[in-house]
Amino acid sequence: MYKKLEALNKIQHKNKSVAEVSNFLYSKELMNAPVALSEFFEACKNYPIFFAKDKDEKWFATVLLGYKQGENLFVDKKGVWKELHYIPAFVRSYPFILVNQEDKKEMVIAIEGEYLDEKESSKKLFNEDGENSEFLNSAITFLNQFYADSLGTADFIKQLESWELLEEKIVNIVNTKEEKFSFNGFFIINEEKLKHLSKKKKDDIC
């Protein structure tokens, strides 16, 4: 989804603005998207939610948007997201994203370079006094909230794991064209074990 990320810099980007993101074509090749616990209620109405681990062995939740790499079945050729379907916060945060610094001690805000310009019609990143614009502060708030929610989601999944509620699942799907797809490395909640979970633990989940 991101092709030319630039870490936000007050000096380098002091005169830069951000062009309007008018459609979702940027996500047309997004096969799956991370979601936070706060999104589960809406997201599960439209997409299957799975749990997985990243390269650092950290848990995250994700929704499946396509059957193969480079495919998002919910975005049409004009970049319109399928009507009445929830759009994940990760997708809505574009063209901004939080990324790890090299030392991994702090997260920094980065932006898709293709959307940077100096046009009057675009939204300024910084005011004339060099302070963050209202537009940028709004984006930062959104990113920080999603990041905090993602950390909480990882803790939630770790709790499920400690109660032995997770099971690895190989997902086999046949689409309308009779094409077969198989996915592994995903985990789901074992419903039978969940039924026998103590009331206290169920309350803790909720």
Language model feature labels by segment:
Residues 1-65:
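Short, extreme N-terminal leader segments that mark the start of a protein/domain
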Residues 48, 95-97, 193:
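Short, surface-exposed charged micro-motifs
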Residues 103-206:
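A contiguous, surface-oriented mixed alpha/beta subdomain in the mid-to-C-terminal portion of proteins
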Residues 25-28, 69-79, 149-155:
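Short, basic/low-complexity N-terminal boundary segments at the transition from targeting/disordered tails
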Residues 44, 86-89, 151, 189:
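Short, well-structured alpha-helical interface segments that form or flank functional binding sites
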Residues 43-46, 92-93, 165-169:
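A short, compositionally biased
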Residues 60-126:
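Aromatic- and glycine-enriched beta-alpha-beta binding-site module
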